[in-house]
From Swiss-Prot:
Name this protein carries in UniProt: Methionine--tRNA ligase
Cofactor entry: Zn(2+)
Binding locations of Zn(2+): C147, C150, C160, C163
General function of this protein: Is required not only for elongation of protein synthesis but also for the initiation of all mRNA translation through initiator tRNA(fMet) aminoacylation.
SUPFAM superfamilies named among the record's database cross-references: Anticodon-binding domain of a subclass of class I aminoacyl-tRNA synthetases, Methionyl-tRNA synthetase (MetRS), Zn-domain, Nucleic acid-binding proteins, Nucleotidylyl transferase
Record localization: Cytoplasm
EC number in record: 6.1.1.10
UniProt entry keywords in alphabetical sequence: Aminoacyl-tRNA synthetase, ATP-binding, Cytoplasm, Ligase, Metal-binding, Nucleotide-binding, Protein biosynthesis, RNA-binding, tRNA-binding, Zinc
Domain (tRNA-binding) ranges: 601-707
Residues reported to bind ATP: K347
Sequence motif 'KMSKS' region, location on chain: 344-348
Organism the protein comes from: Polaromonas naphthalenivorans (strain CJ2)
C-alpha cells in the first residue's frame, strides 16, 4: 500500500484566553487520528495556530495596556503546557498575524478579485453601526440584538447561534452596543464582499457539500442553507448570501490590498491560517509549499466543532476553489463536551473541567485521552464527561483489564525463564495439557484490520470497545489456563506449558498496546521499553515476539484514578467554600459583612434601573456630581452623588445605573437629592482608591425594578 500524504488541522482558537476543555477534546480527537495515520506509515503534517486578529483582541489589549501583538504573544506563550501535557503532537503552531498569513490572505483575495471568469469581489456602500460613546465602528461581536431570521434574542451581529443564519449587523432588530449599552447610530462606509450568491459559487457548493465529504447530518443541515425556506415563525430565509469580508479602521488585522484603511474581516484570514502555518513549517524545513500543495495525492482534513460549520463548509471551500487552490477532502465535525450529565460548566459551582488543574493534580493525561476516545464517534453528537463513569472506565478498562495482563504474565517469565519469551504459538494449554483455543494470538493479530478501519473512520468508541473485548478474552484465557498451578511444578513439560501461556499472554499484551498506541502514546513508549522492542506500527501486528526474545523487569505502568483527585478537580475555588470562609479573617472590601436582615427588610428598599440623561459638576463642591435621571416615571429626578473623584460628567451621560428610588428626598446645600445612585468602593480609600458606579448589563431599561 502506497504512503498517503495528509495535511491535518484543528480549528484555530481565538487568542483572547487560555485553552478550555473543549479545545483539548478536539485536539485529542485529531491527535489520535494523526497518530494512527503515522502508525500506518503515512506522512502527516499536523498544524495549528492562534486566531490573532479582530476588534475584540484590539479592545482587550487596550484594556490590558498592551499592543495587540504583545497581547497575542502573551496568550500564545501559555499554549505549550496544555499541548505537551496532553501529548498533542502538532508539527507546528503559528499565528494568523504571521508574515505567511499576511502574504497568503492577500494573494487569495487578489485571486478571487481577478478571477478570469469574472471577479468574485465587489464593493458596496453600506450603513454600518457606530458607537457614539466609544467613537468607533462596532465589530459584529460587539453588536447584539434580535435575529432577523428566527427572532432569537441577544444574537451577535454577524450570525445567529440559534438558527445558523448569516447576516449584516444592520439586519438585527433592536440592536445595542455590547460595549456601552447605547443604541448605535448608522454611518455609511464602503465594504468589500465575497459574492457567495454568484451562480458559480452556488453550483460548486451544492456539489461539493453533497458528494459524501461531509457527515450525513452535517450535509443535510448545509443543504437547507441553499433554498428559500419557511421558518417556524412564518418568515422566509433565502439561499446563500454575499459575505462581508471587510472592516474599517481602527482594526487589528490584515489590510486589504489597494484599499487603505480597510481590513480583512477575521473570518477571511483565520482559515487561511491553516495554510500559513503549513507554509511556515515547510519553509523552515526547506521544502516547497507550492509543490506540496500541488501534489494531486495530497489529502486535506479539518477537525472543527459544530458551531463553525457555516464558515468551513461554505466560505472556506468556495474561497479556495475560486482562487485556484485545493479544497478540503473532508471536514470532520464534532459535538460539544458537557460535564456530569449535561450540566453547564461553571468554575464557581465546581462543574467546570480546567485542563491545567487536571494536570496539576497529578492526573494522568492518558486517562482523559482514553475516556474521550471511548465516547467519541464519527458523528457530531455531544458527549458528556461524567466523573463516576470516568473513574469506572479508567480503573476497569485500562488498569483492571489491559495493564493487568502484563502484570500477571511478566513475573512468571522473569522468575522462571530468565525473562525469555517461549513458543507463542497461539493456543493456551490448560493444566491437563489440552489446548484452550478460545482466543488464539493469530486471531488477535487479525483484528488489526478491523481496528484500523475504525480508527480511519474516527469511530474511536467502537475501536476502544473492540480492544477491551480482546482484553477480556485474554484475561479469561489466562484464568482458564490456571498458570499459577503450573508454576508450582518443576516438571519440564509443565514448565514448558507455563512459558508458552505467559509468552502468549505477553504477545497479546503487545498487540493490545499496538492497538491503543494512538490513544496512549506515552504508555506505549513505556511498554516498548519493557518489551525491548522498536516503536510499534500497525505493520507489526503479524510480527510476533520470537522465541528467546528477552523482556525487561515489569514495573507498574499505570495507577488507578483516586476519587480524591476527582473531588479536587471539581472542587469550587477555595474562596467560595465554607471552610475557607471560616479560615479567612480579612474582611471583604475592608469591612465586615453587615448583620443579617430578613427578606422583608430588603423588600422595603426599592431599587430601580435609571438612565443618566445628564451629568454636571456642582459648583462649590469637589466631591459631588449632579445627575439627571430617568427612572421611567415620566419625569426626571435630580440626584447628587459623591463620585466626582472618579468620573468625568461626560463619561456618565447615556449610561444606565441603579437608583434607590424610595429614599426620602434630602435637602442639601446645592438643592434637593431625590434618591441615591449605588456605587462600590473599598473601606480603605487610601490603599484601595476608586469609586465604581453600578451599571446593569445591556437590555435593562429605565424603571425596571431589581428584585
Amino acid at each position: 500500500m502506497s504512503q498517503r500524504r495528509l495535511f491535518v488541522t484543528t480549528a484555530l482558537p481565538y487568542a483572547n484566553g487560555n485553552f478550555h476543555i473543549g479545545h483539548i477534546m478536539e485536539y485529542i480527537q485529531a491527535d489520535i487520528w494523526v497518530r494512527y495515520q503515522r502508525m500506518q506509515g503515512n506522512a502527516v503534517n499536523f498544524v495549528g495556530a492562534d486566531d490573532a486578529h479582530g476588534a475584540p483582541i484590539m479592545i482587550a489589549a487596550e484594556k490590558a495596556g498592551k499592543t495587540p501583538q504583545q497581547f497575542v504573544a502573551d496568550i500564545a506563550s501559555g499554549r505549550k503546557p496544555y499541548l505537551d501535557g496532553f501529548h498533542i503532537s502538532f508539527d507546528n503552531w503559528s499565528s494568523t498575524d504571521s508574515p505567511e498569513n499576511h502574504e497568503l490572505a492577500r494573494q487569495i483575495y487578489r485571486d478571487l478579485r481577478d478571477n478570469p471568469q469574472g471577479s468574485l469581489i465587489e464593493t458596496k456602500t453600506i450603513e454600518q453601526f457606530f458607537d457614539p460613546e466609544k467613537n468607533m465602528f462596532l465589530p459584529d461581536r460587539f453588536i447584539k440584538g434580535e435575529c432577523p431570521k428566527c427572532h432569537a434574542k441577544d444574537q451577535y451581529g454577524d450570525n445567529c447561534e440559534v438558527c445558523g443564519a448569516v447576516y449584516a449587523p444592520t439586519d438585527l432588530i433592536n440592536p445595542y452596543s455590547a460595549l456601552s449599552g447605547v443604541t448605535p447610530v448608522l454611518k455609511s462606509s464602503e465594504h468589500f464582499f465575497f459574492k457567495l450568491s454568484d451562480a458559480r459559487c452556488v453550483e460548486f457548493l451544492e456539489s461539493w457539500t453533497q458528494d459524501g465529504k461531509l457527515q450525513p447530518e452535517v450535509a443535510n443541515k448545509v443543504k437547507e442553507w441553499f433554498s428559500v425556506r419557511e421558518n417556524a415563525d412564518g418568515t422566509q430565509s433565502e439561499g446563500l448570501g454575499d459575505w462581508d469580508i471587510s472592516r474599517d479602521a481602527p482594526y487589528f488585522g490584515i489590510e486589504i490590498p489597494d484599499a487603505p484603511g480597510k481590513y480583512f474581516y477575521v473570518w477571511l484570514d483565520a482559515p487561511v491560517g491553516y495554510l500559513a502555518s503549513l507554509k511556515n513549517l515547510l519553509d523552515r524545513r526547506g521544502e516547497s509549499y507550492d509543490d506540496y500543495m500541488a501534489d494531486p495525492k495530497l489529502e486535506q482534513y479539518h477537525f472543527i466543532g459544530k458551531d463553525i460549520v457555516t464558515f468551513h463548509t461554505l466560505f472556506w471551500p468556495a474561497m479556495l476553489h475560486f482562487s485556484g487552490r485545493k479544497t478540503p477532502d473532508n471536514i470532520f465535525v464534532h459535538g460539544f463536551l458537557t460535564v456530569n450529565n449535561g450540566e453547564k460548566m461553571s468554575k464557581s459551582r465546581g462543574t467546570g473541567l480546567d485542563p491545567l488543574k487536571y494536570l496539576s493534580l497529578g492526573m494522568n493525561p492518558e486517562w482523559l485521552r482514553y475516556y474521550l476516545a471511548a465516547k467519541l464517534n464519527a458523528r457530531n453528537e455531544d458527549i458528556d464527561f461524567n466523573a463516576d463513569d470516568f473513574m469506572a472506565r479508567v480503573n476497569s478498562d485500562l488498569v483492571g483489564k489491559f495493564i493487568n495482563i502484563a502484570s500477571r504474565a511478566a513475573g512468571f517469565l522473569t522468575k522462571r525463564f530468565d525473562g525469555k519469551i517461549g513458543d507463542a504459538s497461539g493456543d493456551f494449554p490448560n493444566p491437563d495439557g489440552q489446548g484452550y483455543p478460545s482466543l488464539a494470538i493469530s486471531e488477535i493479530g487479525a483484528c488489526a484490520a478491523e481496528i484500523s478501519e475504525l480508527y480511519e473512520q474516527r469511530e474511536l468508541g467502537k475501536a476502544m470497545r473492540k480492544i477491551m473485548e480482546i482484553a477480556d478474552g485474554l484475561n479469561s484465557d489466562w484464568d482458564a489456563a490456571q498458570p499459577w498451578k503450573l508454576a508450582k511444578s518443576e516438571e519440564p513439560q509443565q514448565l514448558a506449558r507455563l512459558q508458552r501461556i505467559c509468552s502468549n499472554t505477553i504477545e497479546g499484551f503487545r498487540l493490545l498496546t499496538l492497538y491503543l498506541k494512538p490513544v496512549l502514546p506515552a504508555l506505549a513508549i513505556e511498554v516498548e521499553s519493557f518489551l525491548k522492542i522498536d516503536p510499534l506500527n500497525f505493520s507489526d501486528a503479524t510480527k510476533a515476539l520470537p522465541k528467546g526474545h528477552p523482556i525487561g523487569d515489569y514495573k507498574h505502568l499505570m495507577q488507578r484514578v483516586d476519587v480524591k483527585q476527582l473531588d479536587a478537580l471539581f472542587e469550587p475555588p477555595a474562596q467560595d467554600t465554607p471552610a475557607q470562609a471560616a479560615i479567612e479573617t480579612v474582611a471583604p472590601g475592608g469591612e465586615d459583612i453587615a448583620p443579617a436582615i430578613t427578606i422583608d427588610d430588603f423588600a422595603k428598599v426599592d431599587l430601580r434601573i435609571a438612565k443618566i440623561v445628564n451629568c454636571e459638576a456642582v459648583e462649590g463642591s469637589t466631591k459631588l456630581l449632579r445627575l439627571t435621571l430617568d427612572a421611567g416615571e415620566g419625569r426626571m429626578r435630580n440626584v447628587f452623588s459623591g463620585i466626582a473623584s472618579s468620573y468625568r460628567p461626560a463619561d456618565l451621560i447615556g449610561k444606565h445605573t441603579v437608583l434607590v428610588a424610595n429614599l426620602a428626598p434630602r435637602k442639601m446645600k446645592f438643592g434637593i437629592s431625590e434618591g441615591m445612585v449605588l456605587a462600590a468602593s473599598h473601606a480603605d480609600e487610601k490603599s484601595n482608591p476608586g469609586i465604581y458606579v453600578l451599571e446593569p448589563l445591556p437590555g435593562a431599561t429605565p424603571g425596571m425594578r431589581i428584585h
